[in-house]
Amino acid sequence: MNRMLTIIAISLCYFVFAVLLNSVGTVILQSITTFDVSKTDASTLEGFKDLSIAFVSFFIASFIPRIGYQVALCLGLVLVAVVCLLTPMFAEFYFIKVLFAAIGTAFALVKISVYSLIGQLSSNTKTHSSLMNTVEGIFMVGVLSGYWIFSGFIDPNDPASLAWLNVYYLLGGMITIAAIFVYFVPIEREPFTGAQTGALSEFLDMLKLTYQPLVLMFVISVFLYVLVEQGIGSWLPTFNREVLGLPVDISIQLTSIFAAMIAIGRLLAGFLLRFVPWYIFINGCLVMMFLTILLTLPMTQVSESQVVTGIFDAPLAAYLLPAIGLFMAPIYPLINSVVLSALPNKQHAKMTGLIVIFSALGGTFGSFLTGVIFDKFGGQHAFYMSLIPIVMIMFSLFIFKKLSANRRSTLVKGA
Protein backbone atom coordinates (compact mmCIF):
# COMPACT_ATOMS: atom_id res chain seq x y z
CA MET A 1 0.00 0.00 0.00
CA ASN A 2 1.40 3.37 -1.05
CA ARG A 3 1.32 5.42 2.15
CA MET A 4 1.33 8.87 0.56
CA LEU A 5 -1.32 8.08 -2.06
CA THR A 6 -3.51 6.51 0.61
CA ILE A 7 -3.19 9.60 2.81
CA ILE A 8 -4.11 11.80 -0.16
CA ALA A 9 -7.11 9.57 -0.92
CA ILE A 10 -8.52 9.64 2.61
CA SER A 11 -7.80 13.36 2.89
CA LEU A 12 -9.70 14.00 -0.36
CA CYS A 13 -12.67 12.00 0.96
CA TYR A 14 -12.63 13.94 4.20
CA PHE A 15 -12.38 17.26 2.35
CA VAL A 16 -15.50 16.74 0.22
CA PHE A 17 -17.51 15.36 3.13
CA ALA A 18 -16.41 18.30 5.25
CA VAL A 19 -18.07 20.65 2.78
CA LEU A 20 -21.29 18.62 2.86
CA LEU A 21 -21.54 17.71 6.53
CA ASN A 22 -20.80 21.14 7.88
CA SER A 23 -23.02 22.92 5.38
CA VAL A 24 -25.87 22.09 7.75
CA GLY A 25 -25.57 25.48 9.48
CA THR A 26 -25.80 27.28 6.16
CA VAL A 27 -28.65 25.04 4.99
CA ILE A 28 -30.54 25.61 8.26
CA LEU A 29 -30.36 29.37 7.68
CA GLN A 30 -31.33 29.03 4.01
CA SER A 31 -34.17 26.61 4.80
CA ILE A 32 -35.63 29.12 7.26
CA THR A 33 -35.31 31.81 4.60
CA THR A 34 -36.20 29.88 1.43
CA PHE A 35 -38.67 27.22 2.58
CA ASP A 36 -40.17 29.27 5.46
CA VAL A 37 -39.70 26.59 8.11
CA SER A 38 -39.36 27.21 11.85
CA LYS A 39 -36.04 26.98 13.70
CA THR A 40 -37.24 23.85 15.46
CA ASP A 41 -38.10 22.21 12.13
CA ALA A 42 -34.82 23.34 10.58
CA SER A 43 -32.88 21.84 13.49
CA THR A 44 -34.09 18.37 12.44
CA LEU A 45 -31.64 18.47 9.52
CA GLU A 46 -28.85 17.72 11.97
CA GLY A 47 -30.81 14.70 13.11
CA PHE A 48 -31.29 13.37 9.58
CA LYS A 49 -27.54 13.64 9.10
CA ASP A 50 -26.29 12.44 12.46
CA LEU A 51 -28.87 9.76 13.21
CA SER A 52 -28.17 8.25 9.79
CA ILE A 53 -24.51 8.16 10.76
CA ALA A 54 -25.36 6.51 14.08
CA PHE A 55 -27.80 3.98 12.60
CA VAL A 56 -25.50 2.86 9.80
CA SER A 57 -22.45 2.76 12.08
CA PHE A 58 -24.33 0.72 14.63
CA PHE A 59 -25.04 -2.07 12.18
CA ILE A 60 -22.12 -2.09 9.73
CA ALA A 61 -19.00 -0.95 11.62
CA SER A 62 -17.80 -4.48 12.27
CA PHE A 63 -18.47 -5.59 8.67
CA ILE A 64 -16.52 -2.92 6.79
CA PRO A 65 -13.17 -4.77 7.17
CA ARG A 66 -14.77 -7.71 5.35
CA ILE A 67 -15.79 -5.75 2.25
CA GLY A 68 -12.63 -3.64 2.31
CA TYR A 69 -12.09 0.02 3.13
CA GLN A 70 -11.62 1.01 -0.51
CA VAL A 71 -14.99 -0.44 -1.50
CA ALA A 72 -16.68 1.29 1.45
CA LEU A 73 -15.17 4.65 0.49
CA CYS A 74 -16.30 4.32 -3.13
CA LEU A 75 -19.83 3.29 -2.15
CA GLY A 76 -20.20 6.30 0.12
CA LEU A 77 -18.90 8.74 -2.48
CA VAL A 78 -21.10 7.43 -5.30
CA LEU A 79 -24.25 7.51 -3.14
CA VAL A 80 -23.77 11.16 -2.19
CA ALA A 81 -22.77 12.23 -5.70
CA VAL A 82 -26.07 10.93 -7.09
CA VAL A 83 -28.23 12.57 -4.40
CA CYS A 84 -26.39 15.89 -4.74
CA LEU A 85 -27.13 16.00 -8.46
CA LEU A 86 -30.83 15.33 -7.78
CA THR A 87 -31.26 17.97 -5.05
CA PRO A 88 -31.66 21.08 -7.28
CA MET A 89 -34.22 19.19 -9.39
CA PHE A 90 -36.54 18.52 -6.43
CA ALA A 91 -35.88 21.82 -4.59
CA GLU A 92 -38.08 21.02 -1.57
CA PHE A 93 -37.34 20.91 2.15
CA TYR A 94 -38.25 17.21 2.35
CA PHE A 95 -35.54 16.39 -0.19
CA ILE A 96 -33.02 18.40 1.81
CA LYS A 97 -33.78 15.90 4.58
CA VAL A 98 -33.18 13.06 2.12
CA LEU A 99 -29.88 14.67 1.13
CA PHE A 100 -28.60 14.87 4.70
CA ALA A 101 -29.75 11.32 5.40
CA ALA A 102 -27.70 10.17 2.41
CA ILE A 103 -24.73 12.26 3.53
CA GLY A 104 -24.91 10.70 6.99
CA THR A 105 -25.21 7.18 5.63
CA ALA A 106 -22.22 7.65 3.36
CA PHE A 107 -20.09 9.36 5.99
CA ALA A 108 -20.53 6.41 8.34
CA LEU A 109 -18.80 4.28 5.71
CA VAL A 110 -16.14 6.90 5.07
CA LYS A 111 -15.26 7.77 8.67
CA ILE A 112 -14.91 4.18 9.84
CA SER A 113 -12.75 3.42 6.80
CA VAL A 114 -10.57 6.51 7.23
CA TYR A 115 -9.98 5.99 10.95
CA SER A 116 -9.13 2.33 10.38
CA LEU A 117 -6.72 3.19 7.55
CA ILE A 118 -5.02 5.75 9.80
CA GLY A 119 -4.37 2.89 12.21
CA GLN A 120 -2.79 0.83 9.43
CA LEU A 121 -0.63 3.76 8.34
CA SER A 122 0.67 4.53 11.86
CA SER A 123 3.41 2.72 13.74
CA ASN A 124 3.00 4.28 17.20
CA THR A 125 0.95 6.72 19.29
CA LYS A 126 2.86 9.81 18.14
CA THR A 127 2.51 9.09 14.42
CA HIS A 128 -1.13 8.16 14.95
CA SER A 129 -1.90 11.43 16.77
CA SER A 130 0.01 13.45 14.19
CA LEU A 131 -1.73 11.86 11.19
CA MET A 132 -5.12 12.03 12.93
CA ASN A 133 -4.74 15.76 13.58
CA THR A 134 -3.49 16.37 10.04
CA VAL A 135 -6.46 14.58 8.45
CA GLU A 136 -8.90 16.32 10.80
CA GLY A 137 -7.17 19.60 9.97
CA ILE A 138 -7.76 18.98 6.26
CA PHE A 139 -11.36 18.22 7.16
CA MET A 140 -11.66 21.68 8.68
CA VAL A 141 -10.06 23.26 5.61
CA GLY A 142 -12.92 21.66 3.69
CA VAL A 143 -15.40 23.13 6.15
CA LEU A 144 -13.79 26.56 5.70
CA SER A 145 -14.01 26.27 1.92
CA GLY A 146 -17.63 25.16 2.13
CA TYR A 147 -18.87 28.38 3.68
CA TRP A 148 -17.43 30.42 0.81
CA ILE A 149 -18.62 27.94 -1.82
CA PHE A 150 -22.19 28.12 -0.53
CA SER A 151 -22.18 31.90 -0.02
CA GLY A 152 -21.11 32.30 -3.64
CA PHE A 153 -24.40 30.76 -4.78
CA ILE A 154 -26.62 32.92 -2.55
CA ASP A 155 -28.17 36.02 -4.11
CA PRO A 156 -27.61 38.84 -1.56
CA ASN A 157 -30.47 40.79 -3.15
CA ASP A 158 -32.86 37.84 -2.91
CA PRO A 159 -31.75 35.44 -0.14
CA ALA A 160 -34.99 33.46 -0.54
CA SER A 161 -34.12 32.50 -4.12
CA LEU A 162 -33.66 28.80 -4.90
CA ALA A 163 -30.51 29.59 -6.88
CA TRP A 164 -28.32 28.50 -3.94
CA LEU A 165 -29.32 24.87 -4.59
CA ASN A 166 -27.22 24.93 -7.76
CA VAL A 167 -24.19 24.52 -5.50
CA TYR A 168 -25.01 20.82 -5.39
CA TYR A 169 -24.17 20.42 -9.08
CA LEU A 170 -20.65 21.62 -8.29
CA LEU A 171 -20.39 19.41 -5.22
CA GLY A 172 -21.67 16.39 -7.13
CA GLY A 173 -18.88 16.87 -9.64
CA MET A 174 -16.24 17.21 -6.91
CA ILE A 175 -17.41 14.02 -5.22
CA THR A 176 -17.33 12.13 -8.51
CA ILE A 177 -13.69 13.15 -9.01
CA ALA A 178 -12.88 11.99 -5.46
CA ALA A 179 -14.55 8.62 -6.11
CA ILE A 180 -12.51 8.07 -9.27
CA PHE A 181 -9.27 8.89 -7.43
CA VAL A 182 -10.06 6.53 -4.54
CA TYR A 183 -10.99 3.76 -6.98
CA PHE A 184 -7.58 3.84 -8.67
CA VAL A 185 -5.42 4.22 -5.53
CA PRO A 186 -3.85 0.87 -4.51
CA ILE A 187 -5.30 0.46 -1.02
CA GLU A 188 -4.54 -2.97 0.39
CA ARG A 189 -7.42 -4.91 1.86
CA GLU A 190 -6.55 -5.87 5.43
CA PRO A 191 -6.92 -9.63 5.97
CA PHE A 192 -9.92 -10.44 8.12
CA THR A 193 -8.62 -12.39 11.11
CA GLY A 194 -11.72 -12.60 13.26
CA ALA A 195 -13.80 -15.73 13.66
CA GLN A 196 -16.79 -16.14 11.39
CA THR A 197 -19.28 -15.48 14.19
CA GLY A 198 -22.19 -13.92 12.33
CA ALA A 199 -23.86 -10.54 12.31
CA LEU A 200 -25.42 -10.55 15.77
CA SER A 201 -22.24 -11.70 17.48
CA GLU A 202 -20.11 -9.03 15.80
CA PHE A 203 -22.66 -6.36 16.66
CA LEU A 204 -22.59 -7.42 20.31
CA ASP A 205 -18.79 -7.46 20.25
CA MET A 206 -18.81 -3.75 19.44
CA LEU A 207 -21.24 -3.02 22.26
CA LYS A 208 -19.10 -4.96 24.73
CA LEU A 209 -16.40 -2.31 24.44
CA THR A 210 -18.67 0.05 26.42
CA TYR A 211 -18.61 -2.37 29.37
CA GLN A 212 -15.15 -1.07 30.14
CA PRO A 213 -15.39 2.03 32.40
CA LEU A 214 -12.54 3.69 30.52
CA VAL A 215 -14.32 3.37 27.17
CA LEU A 216 -17.63 4.44 28.73
CA MET A 217 -16.13 7.69 30.05
CA PHE A 218 -14.50 8.23 26.68
CA VAL A 219 -17.77 7.99 24.71
CA ILE A 220 -19.46 10.31 27.23
CA SER A 221 -16.71 12.86 26.62
CA VAL A 222 -17.14 12.51 22.86
CA PHE A 223 -20.90 12.97 23.16
CA LEU A 224 -20.56 16.15 25.21
CA TYR A 225 -17.85 17.65 23.01
CA VAL A 226 -19.80 17.17 19.78
CA LEU A 227 -22.91 18.52 21.50
CA VAL A 228 -21.05 21.80 22.08
CA GLU A 229 -19.32 21.97 18.70
CA GLN A 230 -22.44 21.26 16.64
CA GLY A 231 -24.66 23.40 18.82
CA ILE A 232 -22.45 26.40 18.14
CA GLY A 233 -21.25 25.57 14.63
CA SER A 234 -24.66 24.69 13.19
CA TRP A 235 -26.35 27.80 14.55
CA LEU A 236 -23.59 30.38 14.15
CA PRO A 237 -24.83 31.56 10.69
CA THR A 238 -28.34 32.06 12.10
CA PHE A 239 -26.85 33.76 15.19
CA ASN A 240 -24.96 36.17 12.94
CA ARG A 241 -28.11 36.85 10.94
CA GLU A 242 -30.68 37.24 13.71
CA VAL A 243 -28.70 38.37 16.76
CA LEU A 244 -25.99 40.47 15.11
CA GLY A 245 -28.27 41.54 12.24
CA LEU A 246 -25.82 40.73 9.44
CA PRO A 247 -26.84 40.06 5.81
CA VAL A 248 -27.25 36.38 4.90
CA ASP A 249 -24.15 36.07 2.71
CA ILE A 250 -21.95 37.88 5.24
CA SER A 251 -23.39 35.78 8.09
CA ILE A 252 -22.24 32.65 6.27
CA GLN A 253 -18.85 34.06 5.26
CA LEU A 254 -18.01 35.13 8.82
CA THR A 255 -18.86 31.65 10.07
CA SER A 256 -15.85 30.50 8.07
CA ILE A 257 -13.71 32.08 10.81
CA PHE A 258 -14.98 29.33 13.12
CA ALA A 259 -13.87 26.67 10.65
CA ALA A 260 -10.56 28.44 10.03
CA MET A 261 -9.79 28.50 13.75
CA ILE A 262 -10.55 24.79 14.08
CA ALA A 263 -8.38 24.00 11.06
CA ILE A 264 -5.48 26.05 12.41
CA GLY A 265 -5.89 24.60 15.89
CA ARG A 266 -5.86 21.00 14.68
CA LEU A 267 -2.87 21.52 12.43
CA LEU A 268 -0.94 23.21 15.26
CA ALA A 269 -1.96 20.60 17.82
CA GLY A 270 0.09 17.94 16.05
CA PHE A 271 3.19 20.02 16.80
CA LEU A 272 2.31 21.26 20.31
CA LEU A 273 1.38 17.81 21.61
CA ARG A 274 4.99 16.74 21.22
CA PHE A 275 5.81 18.95 24.20
CA VAL A 276 2.61 19.21 26.27
CA PRO A 277 0.84 16.24 27.94
CA TRP A 278 -2.54 15.63 26.31
CA TYR A 279 -4.59 15.99 29.52
CA ILE A 280 -3.11 19.37 30.44
CA PHE A 281 -3.51 20.51 26.84
CA ILE A 282 -7.21 19.59 26.67
CA ASN A 283 -8.06 21.23 29.98
CA GLY A 284 -6.37 24.43 28.88
CA CYS A 285 -8.51 24.38 25.74
CA LEU A 286 -11.72 23.82 27.73
CA VAL A 287 -10.96 26.73 30.07
CA MET A 288 -10.37 29.03 27.10
CA MET A 289 -13.64 27.88 25.48
CA PHE A 290 -15.50 28.73 28.67
CA LEU A 291 -13.92 32.18 28.91
CA THR A 292 -14.51 32.97 25.23
CA ILE A 293 -18.26 32.38 25.56
CA LEU A 294 -18.52 34.12 28.92
CA LEU A 295 -16.68 37.26 27.78
CA THR A 296 -17.89 37.54 24.18
CA LEU A 297 -21.67 37.05 24.38
CA PRO A 298 -22.25 40.29 26.34
CA MET A 299 -20.69 42.09 23.36
CA THR A 300 -23.37 40.81 20.95
CA GLN A 301 -25.80 43.58 21.88
CA VAL A 302 -25.60 45.43 18.57
CA SER A 303 -27.24 48.75 17.80
CA GLU A 304 -30.17 48.50 15.37
CA SER A 305 -28.85 51.57 13.57
CA GLN A 306 -25.64 49.80 12.60
CA VAL A 307 -25.51 49.00 8.88
CA VAL A 308 -23.27 46.18 7.63
CA THR A 309 -22.53 45.96 3.92
CA GLY A 310 -19.31 43.94 4.02
CA ILE A 311 -17.39 41.59 6.29
CA PHE A 312 -15.17 44.43 7.52
CA ASP A 313 -18.22 46.37 8.75
CA ALA A 314 -19.25 43.60 11.13
CA PRO A 315 -19.07 44.20 14.90
CA LEU A 316 -16.12 42.87 16.91
CA ALA A 317 -18.23 40.09 18.44
CA ALA A 318 -18.73 38.59 14.97
CA TYR A 319 -14.98 37.91 14.89
CA LEU A 320 -14.38 37.00 18.53
CA LEU A 321 -17.12 34.40 19.00
CA PRO A 322 -15.98 32.14 16.11
CA ALA A 323 -12.46 32.24 17.60
CA ILE A 324 -13.67 29.64 20.09
CA GLY A 325 -12.92 27.15 17.33
CA LEU A 326 -9.19 27.54 17.98
CA PHE A 327 -9.62 26.06 21.46
CA MET A 328 -12.18 23.44 20.41
CA ALA A 329 -9.88 22.24 17.65
CA PRO A 330 -7.62 19.60 19.23
CA ILE A 331 -10.12 18.03 21.63
CA TYR A 332 -12.03 15.66 19.35
CA PRO A 333 -9.15 14.10 17.38
CA LEU A 334 -6.98 13.95 20.50
CA ILE A 335 -9.35 11.99 22.72
CA ASN A 336 -10.13 9.71 19.77
CA SER A 337 -6.44 9.12 19.21
CA VAL A 338 -5.75 8.37 22.89
CA VAL A 339 -8.20 5.47 22.79
CA LEU A 340 -7.57 4.19 19.26
CA SER A 341 -3.79 4.14 19.64
CA ALA A 342 -4.17 1.90 22.69
CA LEU A 343 -6.25 -0.66 20.79
CA PRO A 344 -5.00 -3.32 18.36
CA ASN A 345 -5.78 -2.56 14.72
CA LYS A 346 -8.39 -5.33 14.53
CA GLN A 347 -10.54 -3.45 17.09
CA HIS A 348 -10.31 -0.05 15.40
CA ALA A 349 -13.39 -0.54 13.23
CA LYS A 350 -15.53 -1.47 16.25
CA MET A 351 -14.21 1.36 18.40
CA THR A 352 -14.60 3.82 15.54
CA GLY A 353 -18.19 2.64 15.22
CA LEU A 354 -18.79 3.70 18.81
CA ILE A 355 -17.07 7.03 18.19
CA VAL A 356 -19.26 7.71 15.16
CA ILE A 357 -22.44 6.67 17.00
CA PHE A 358 -21.90 8.86 20.05
CA SER A 359 -20.62 11.74 17.93
CA ALA A 360 -23.80 11.55 15.88
CA LEU A 361 -26.04 11.42 18.93
CA GLY A 362 -24.22 14.35 20.50
CA GLY A 363 -24.47 16.41 17.33
CA THR A 364 -28.18 15.69 16.91
CA PHE A 365 -29.05 16.55 20.49
CA GLY A 366 -26.80 19.62 20.54
CA SER A 367 -28.24 21.13 17.38
CA PHE A 368 -31.84 20.35 18.34
CA LEU A 369 -31.46 21.72 21.88
CA THR A 370 -29.78 24.88 20.59
CA GLY A 371 -32.52 25.32 17.98
CA VAL A 372 -35.32 24.97 20.52
CA ILE A 373 -33.69 27.41 22.98
CA PHE A 374 -32.89 29.80 20.12
CA ASP A 375 -36.54 29.67 19.00
CA LYS A 376 -37.98 30.20 22.48
CA PHE A 377 -35.45 32.41 24.27
CA GLY A 378 -33.07 33.81 21.66
CA GLY A 379 -29.57 33.13 20.39
CA GLN A 380 -27.66 34.50 23.37
CA HIS A 381 -29.37 32.17 25.84
CA ALA A 382 -28.85 29.25 23.46
CA PHE A 383 -25.09 29.84 23.33
CA TYR A 384 -24.79 30.49 27.08
CA MET A 385 -26.20 27.00 27.65
CA SER A 386 -23.06 25.50 26.08
CA LEU A 387 -21.15 26.43 29.26
CA ILE A 388 -22.83 23.53 31.08
CA PRO A 389 -21.53 20.69 28.86
CA ILE A 390 -18.07 22.31 28.77
CA VAL A 391 -17.84 21.92 32.55
CA MET A 392 -19.21 18.37 32.27
CA ILE A 393 -16.45 17.50 29.78
CA MET A 394 -13.85 18.58 32.34
CA PHE A 395 -15.29 16.15 34.89
CA SER A 396 -15.66 13.26 32.43
CA LEU A 397 -12.09 13.68 31.19
CA PHE A 398 -10.81 13.80 34.77
CA ILE A 399 -12.36 10.38 35.40
CA PHE A 400 -11.15 9.16 32.00
CA LYS A 401 -7.57 10.21 32.78
CA LYS A 402 -7.69 8.56 36.20
CA LEU A 403 -8.97 5.30 34.73
CA SER A 404 -6.41 5.51 31.95
CA ALA A 405 -3.55 5.85 34.42
CA ASN A 406 -4.76 3.06 36.71
CA ARG A 407 -6.15 0.56 34.23
CA ARG A 408 -4.62 1.23 30.82
CA SER A 409 -4.45 -2.49 30.17
CA THR A 410 -8.26 -2.62 30.18
CA LEU A 411 -8.35 -1.20 26.65
CA VAL A 412 -6.40 -4.05 25.09
CA LYS A 413 -8.84 -6.75 26.14
CA GLY A 414 -10.64 -8.35 23.24
CA ALA A 415 -14.25 -7.44 22.69
List each language-model region with its residue ranges:
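A late C-terminal transmembrane helix in Major Facilitator Superfamily
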Residues: L340-F377
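Helix-to-loop junctions at the C-terminal end of transmembrane segments
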Residues: V56-G68, G265-W278, S303-E304, F374
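Conserved MFS/SLC helix-loop-helix module at the cytosolic interface between two early adjacent transmembrane helices
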Residues: F55-Y94
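Intracellular juxtamembrane helix-capping segments at the cytosolic ends
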Residues: L109-S123, A329-P344
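Extracytoplasmic gate region of multi-pass secondary transporters
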Residues: V24-G25, Y211-S256
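Helix-loop-helix hairpin linking two adjacent transmembrane segments in secondary transporters
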Residues: F93-F95, T134-I187
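Cytoplasmic helix-loop-helix junction between adjacent transmembrane helices
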Residues: L99-G137
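C-terminal ends and interior cores of transmembrane alpha-helices
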Residues: V78-A91, M288-G310
